[in-house]
From Swiss-Prot:
This is Acireductone dioxygenase. Gene3D superfamilies: Jelly Rolls. PANTHER family: ACIREDUCTONE DIOXYGENASE. Catalyzes 2 different reactions between oxygen and the acireductone 1,2-dihydroxy-3-keto-5-methylthiopentene (DHK-MTPene) depending upon the metal bound in the active site. Fe-containing acireductone dioxygenase (Fe-ARD) produces formate and 2-keto-4-methylthiobutyrate (KMTB), the alpha-ketoacid precursor of methionine in the methionine recycle pathway. Ni-containing acireductone dioxygenase (Ni-ARD) produces methylthiopropionate, carbon monoxide and formate, and does not lie on the methionine recycle pathway. Its EC number is 1.13.11.54, 1.13.11.53. Pfam families: ARD. HAMAP family: Salvage_MtnD_euk. It comes from Dictyostelium discoideum (Social amoeba). Its main location: cytoplasm. Belongs to the acireductone dioxygenase (ARD) family.
């Protein structure tokens, strides 16, 4: 995981800065099966009872339309939890000063974006991601667009 201000990739942001904004990061070792126990512990501690998986690639029908929806600035009533099983993508979040922070997630990264935080999502140039989504209740994804 790497985070930086949207317009300056060399201005790296610390995990502490993300924590100040209630964005949480958990590295998971996807190269081994070792990630399963810490993942289950996290789910139990935070009350994540449900999950599903999403795969997007260049071959996904309607990919560009889906990506347009994900890239619209929005928030959710619930946390947005993503565990990247393969591929790479970017969460852009708004910090307390309304500045965009870009968070690059890759295989093995788990991020929790808090409820009611404006954000958006994009794929990297490979256009490939396989992510596990975690939920406290039934799996749902309801965006509340900013504009």
């Amino acid at each position: 995981m790497k985070s930086y201000f949207y317009d300056n990739e060399s201005d790296v942001i610390s995990l502490d800065y993300l924590k100040e904004h209630n964005v949480l990061y958990f590295p998971m070792d996807r190269e081994k099966e070792n990630y399963k126990e810490p993942l289950e512990t996290l789910c139990k501690e935070r009350g994540y009872k449900n999950r599903d998986e999403v795969k997007l690639s260049k071959e996904t029908p309607g990919l560009e339309d889906k990506l347009k929806i994900f890239f619209e600035e929005h928030l959710h009533d619930d946390e947005e939890i993503r565990f990247i099983l393969d591929g790479c993508g970017f969460f852009d979040i708004r910090d307390k000063n309304d500045k965009w922070v870009k968070i690059k997630e890759k295989k093995g990264d788990l991020i929790i974006v808090p409820a009611n935080m404006y954000h958006r999502f994009a794929l990297d140039e490979s256009r490939n991601i396989h992510a596990m989504r975690l939920f406290t209740d039934a799996p749902k994804w309801v965006p509340i667009n900013r504009y």
